[in-house]
Every structure is written in structure tokens, then in C-alpha cells.
Amino acid sequence: MFIELRREVETALSEALDACGYPTDDLGIEEPPEDVDAVFASSVAFRLASAAEAPPPAVAGELAAELDAAGREYVGRIEQQGPYLNFFPSEAYFEEALEAGQSERFGELDSKDTSVVVEHTSANPTGPVHVGRARNPIIGDAVANLLSYAGYDVDRHYYVNDAGRQMAVFTWAYETFDESDLPEPARDRAEYRMVRYYRKGNEYLENADPDAVEAAEAEIQDILQGLEDGDEATYERVGEVVDTVLDGMKACLARLPAEFDEFVKETQFMRDGSTDDVVDRLQALDGAVYEDDAWQLAFADIDKNLVFLRADGTSLYTTRDIAHHEWKFDTYDRAVTVLGEDHKLQASQLRETLSLLGNDVDQLDNVIYSYVNLPEGKMSTRRGTGVQLDDLLDEAIDRAREEVETRLGDRLRDDDLDEADVERIAEQVGIGAVRYDIVAKQPSKAITFEWDRALDFEAQSAPYVQYVHARCCGILDEADGLDPEATIAPLDTDAERDLLRTVARLPGVIESAADDHQPHKIATYTRRLADRFNTFYRECPVTTADDAEVRRARLALVAAARHAMANALDILGVEAPESM
């Protein structure tokens, strides 16, 4: 109903502006302050004041005289407040919003018949997932969830870099060194076992005798050239290493969880000839030059050239990624890529090159994020230093378990929890805290992860909003068979109406957040919903209300709040516990 109400507001404003002879291109629709009961407000009078040669309140008054809620289904009344115009919902809006909230699928938008591929994570398969890069799968998974809720047909891809020097070094090291020469792995999982070879190989290349290094580099170059030439045996050798490491990385990412529909390998675009085709077309462009022993593409508005072919005839990552993106454009209507801030230049070069090759780059959107820091400073992936994502998740669960155990005496319900229940809740809360704390911030802003904030049950954190969902479930379980009734008349207090107004906003928040690829807007919504619900919970008894009609209506409101919170958390990839 929120989206339908907004359309009515847009229509009413456009008609009033047209009647007054004003342009209708910018309606100035916004969310009013929290102390205003309106759902929408318009600041359009500020924009028109200069042309009207009148102060904004006078312009607003002129428009208010033309605005009429009569005949509108969801706009109940319209009032001027100084330079602003406030739009208040009708009883029909509240009634239909409460009814819509009874569905477990509340918030899902109609199909847009548009396919979208969301590429995220795509960490090089060289070892465990590092916590500094954890923002990518968390944001990427949330963006994919968000677009799915918004009605898009979404595929989730992990682009596997299986063709660069790192993988050639890794393959050479795996085939060269004996496991007996390696230290014990940090964990008994594939990527932790395999990364020892990669580290050993890099250490050897840095410290070994120059002649030995030269021989090793020749072997590494042979692997690179074999990939470039389409040698099947080389693909199999590299593929064994890549697939083994990826199996372990998948297990780590599944803990978040972040799962994928397809792992698209870089070598696919070497083997099918599309990379060679890209090279030929790039060489034919006016900006293509051969200098510094490589083919490069110069841009009009980007200072740094794109190197797309080495002197030895081997392609580069970005060259293959161009072929990859053209494949995306042929397969999907839209493409979204989640990238770290250190890829900004590469992303700009890629977009410009795709455009020069005749592609419609309006199909492509990037979500750029800054990295995660711990309080002691920025973490590094070089030489295996820093904290792995597994370590962070383990500690999150341990800390959550301690917190849950200390709160067992304050639980809403008197049922007994066994150890398995405590462990389940600890995992839901702990991993949820990590995801929520990371996804709740604007991607472009750096994050310093702090446990006290992430696991604070009283502050606006994952446990805080998860607790609201658990509380809703507890109330509904205590209803003893009393059926909710989605009737608005008994819900006449400010706390009830404020909660319902907030519940009803979810579809609009999803639409706006999806348009901008900003899942943090959903996190903001969950905090507001939690605040409104807690006020309602304090002021409005549900199962103990004196009037049966009030009890049923409030139960319906609790059910709507539960569905709104559950689905908002689902978008964020945070579990919604039924008990805590």
C-alpha cells in the first residue's frame, strides 16, 4: 500500500502544480520528521519560490488550495505546515496495510521480468577468505537478496581468477614441494591445507638462489603460456588446484551464508576464443598503442592506459574480464558487480573500454565498498597475515554464546532450552551480528568492527532487532489459539498506528534500496521497526488486553510486524530467531 499511496501523492501534487501553472518535473516528495504523523511530505514550495516570486509558505498555501483528498483511496487528508505539504493516510490505507502484513511474503514486489546477474566475492582462490574482504560477500549477498525481493530474476556469480600469475605460481608450488616440508595447516580444511604450498612457493621465489628462481620462473611461464594456448593438460593441472581451494572457500562462505548459482571461470573466455576476439577489436580502436613492450589502450578522460596484451602474446585479467562482461550483457538484462575500493580505476577502465567496443554500459552497475578494519588497524592479506573470516565467525559465536547464557533467566518463555538450542541461538546471533554490523553501514564508508557494538542486545544491533522478531513469535505462541483479525478500528492509539505506519513502509523501502543497490537502508528500517515495536510492546498489552476484539487486532499487528522484520532480516542475510 505504501507504493500505491506514494503514487496517489504524486498524482495529486502533479495535478495541483499543473493547475497553478508550475512545472511538474520535481515534486519534492520526502519522508516527514518523526514527530509528524504524515506518511509523505513535499518541499516543492522551496523549489518554486524564486519563479513564483513568493516565499515558500505562500507557494505551499497556493498549492494546498488546489489539493483535495476527496476521491483518493489511500490519501486521507492533506495539510499545509509552513512551507511543507503533508499527506496523511486514510483508514483504507491502514486496513489494507494490516491485511497485507498477514502474508509471510509481505514486502515482496511484483516481477519486473528483468534478469540481473550479481557478481560478488570473486576472491582469488589462493587461500582462506580474509576478514578484510568479508564485506564483499556480505554486501553482495544482501544486494542479490534485495533485488530478488524487488522482483528481479537474480543469478549470483563468483568470477574465478584461474588464469593469472598467482594461479600459475600456486600450481607450480603445489607440484614442486612435498607436504612434509610444510607447517601444519591452521584448520583441517582444503584451502588451509593448500595455502601452505602457495606461501612456500612465494617464499622460495623471494629467497632462493637466482639460478633456481630463474628455473622456477620458466616453469611458471610455461603454465601461463599453456593456459593462453588452450593446452588441455595445463588446464587440468591448474584446475585441480583451483577447484580444491574453492571447495574450502565455499565452506567458509556458506557459514555466512553466501552461496552462488554459478562459479564462472576466467579461462572460459580464453578457451572459447572470446578473449582473442576482444584483443583483435581493441587493437583496431583509435586509442590502441604498442609501447613499453605491450599493447595498451589510451583514454580521453582516464590518465592511466589499459594494458591488454603483453609482448609474449598473453592476455591480462582485465582483457578477459571484458569478454566476461560482454557475455554477461548477452545473457542478462542487467549486471551488478561488488568491488573493493582498490578496484575503482580498473572498474572505470573496464566501463570505458566496454563502451568503446559498442556495448551499452547502462546495463552495468558497480557497488564499491571500503574495507573492514579491526580496532588495532587495517588488516593485510599479504604473506598470510591478518585474521581469517573463519576466525571472526568463531569468535562471534563464542561471544554470542556467553551473552545468551547470561540472559537465560530473562527469557520471554518458560520452556527449557537444551545445549543444542543454545548453540543454535548463539550461531544465529553471532553470525547475524557480524553480517548486520557490516551491511548496516554505507558501503563507501570504512568500518572498524567492534564486538561491544555488534553484540549489544540493548543498542541498535543485530541482537536488538532479532530480539523483536523472537518477541513477536513469543506473543503469537502465547495467544492460545486466538486468531488474529486484521481490523483497524480497534487500533487507535499512537503506538499502534506508529507501528503499523512503519510496517507498511517495507515495500517502499525495498523498492528504493533496490534502485540504489543500498541494503543498508533495509538495516535502518529494521532499527526503526524495532523501536516502534518496543514502544507498542510497552504500551499495548496483547494477549492480556481486556477486549477480545482489541486482542485479535493487536495479534494481527504483531503478525504483520513479525513478517516485516523476518523479511527485512532475510534481505540482509541475518537469521530471524523464533526464540532467544
Curated annotation (Swiss-Prot):
Reactions that this protein is recorded to catalyse: tRNA(Arg) + L-arginine + ATP = L-arginyl-tRNA(Arg) + AMP + diphosphate
Recorded hits in Gene3D superfamilies, A to Z, give: Arginyl tRNA synthetase N-terminal domain, HUPs, Isoleucyl-tRNA Synthetase, Domain 1
Query: Which one Pfam family would you cite for this protein?
Result: DALR_1
Q: Which GO terms are recorded in the biological process aspect for this UniProt protein? A: arginyl-tRNA aminoacylation
Residue positions of motif 'HIGH' region: 123-133
The answer to whether the entry has keyword ATP-binding is: yes
Cite a GO CC annotation: cytoplasm
Looking up NCBIfam families in the UniProt record yields: argS (TIGR00456)
Q: Which HAMAP family match?
A: Arg_tRNA_synth (MF_00123)
User: What protein does this entry describe?
Assistant: Arginine--tRNA ligase
Organism per entry = Natronomonas pharaonis (strain ATCC 35678 / DSM 2160 / CIP 103997 / JCM 8858 / NBRC 14720 / NCIMB 2260 / Gabara) (Halobacterium pharaonis)
Q: Which gene encodes it?
A: argS
